């Protein structure tokens, strides 16, 4: 339908259903308006499980032994509608798991396998995910059998892990607990391209200019182009892409080689046919195809005639067993460029022994050349990667250990701390990339700690700002950051410009002393100080309140912290404290929206927090923009009252700053940023601002502010769930 009149195959016009078209949406009419949709995704209206369903409790009821046994059996239970290569689905399942987890990028923590997002657009229809819809359909009988006790997200990841076990690898472990989403994610920026595989993400030859936060080199790819840079083979240039891409997934060179080699030790590429015979991707497929895409309705299109990437062949001699054959073939043979039957570039060995060739997927009497992609040849030709590969070749046990750990990291990187892992196979070892935090003391005298904080010389602004800065690093995307651990006192956070190091040092010196005197953790005292500041500010406004507090945060140490990995959590902007590190191409209000989504806040929570923080005097470096009150430090609704007062007029000043003048007298009353003004400009945000500006909602404002504040402070308290 085009939004006006639909026309079915029978030609019968209808006038209903127009609002299902994106062409008539508000964003189509006003594309530059602030779109708050990313704050309201994944709510209960789209979730069929009901508000009382708790997957993390339900999965604990799973018969883990029987479930894994069924997964093992599935690997060799070939189905005629989509037969298994060599009678084993391992390669297909690993590719599915890999491409789910591999969409993770460290810059914003988005992507990854933690939500089952591969079931939805755009991932379910990416060119790099051709035929992974078949893998998920093969899993459906198991999902159907175990029902609510297993999420699609967990099942998709575990299928790859079980596949490796089935083929002989001793895996490192597995943690259940990934919760499904029920519609496409709106917050993930996959790139600006309007066409698949568009080569627009780099502007230089050294391949270092990939736009942040992206990790894949082209739209629709998980990693790099397997044929070469922009489809042109050049292993050393591809090596640059590989290093950047895997680095943006938080993988070092050794992990990169291990994952590439381990992923290509089993399974095969599919390109024995003509891609033009493939039908449309799942999102564009005919209704009778029932969500399956890339269906070949012209030729056979399955088994040995399958077309996926277009490259054709296996990497190793024995593609259904874990061994060291990848390095044997890669390092011991010379390779030359060839074209696959589908027309894709691939590398094939020169003068290979017949016994080193893998057999045909259907007829073991037939053997074919193995293949390597340009990324594989990058491992051979890049000097750093080559050295690692040679060590793995000489020490298969070491390779297996490094790969098992790297696979575990790949498939668990976006799950957050180890406390979120569920099940009998969770490794006991703490890993530094899990950002470990020790358990904290819960038995100290909270009232005594609050009394000492209140008696200190810290201002309300200092206490609230420090607590906010400690907690605001939390990312709901990969569950990193937050106040637990008090890493704000460690490198690199203690030196971040956004944390005002001079002010932070002064405040921490006092709070660390209070922690030592009371037996509380510094992490707890930082949050408690913010609460004390809010309680004092509310009391000054005439409201006696107690801000909820849950003790038990621990204090991380430098030894528990990979300082470099925390660089990506540095705030470069914070609309809540009215701060930008520098001018950006993206509008300040959009930057605030992105941070709000990562913190897991809604639009009205964002609204009430900004209004409250402004009057508490928490602006970065004590700037006065947006401080629409003459009672700084008192928790009033003055920000909203003055924002919505038509006695004021807003005049552009300079550099995205504005003057608030008296409409009659013309005198300047306050200054503001775009972040301040958007709460009066955007129709949705203004509706919230008007609620908090009402005379009868002063108490509601404080109540809602405290609730949103507590949500931020406890966002990383997975031990409370």
UniProtKB/Swiss-Prot annotation:
Instruction: List, separated by semicolons, the cofactors it needs.
Output: heme b
Q: Which residues form a coiled coil?
A: none
> What is this protein identified as?
Catalase-peroxidase 1
Picking any one GO biological process from the record gives: hydrogen peroxide catabolic process
Instruction: Write out the similarity annotation.
Output: Belongs to the peroxidase family. Peroxidase/catalase subfamily.
Native organism: Legionella pneumophila (strain Paris)
Annotated site (Transition state stabilizer): 95
**At which positions is heme b bound?**
264
GO molecular-function annotation terms? catalase activity; heme binding; metal ion binding
Query: Which enzyme type, at the first EC level?
Result: oxidoreductase
What residues make up the catalytic site?
Answer: 99 (proton acceptor)
Q: Does the keyword Iron apply?
A: yes
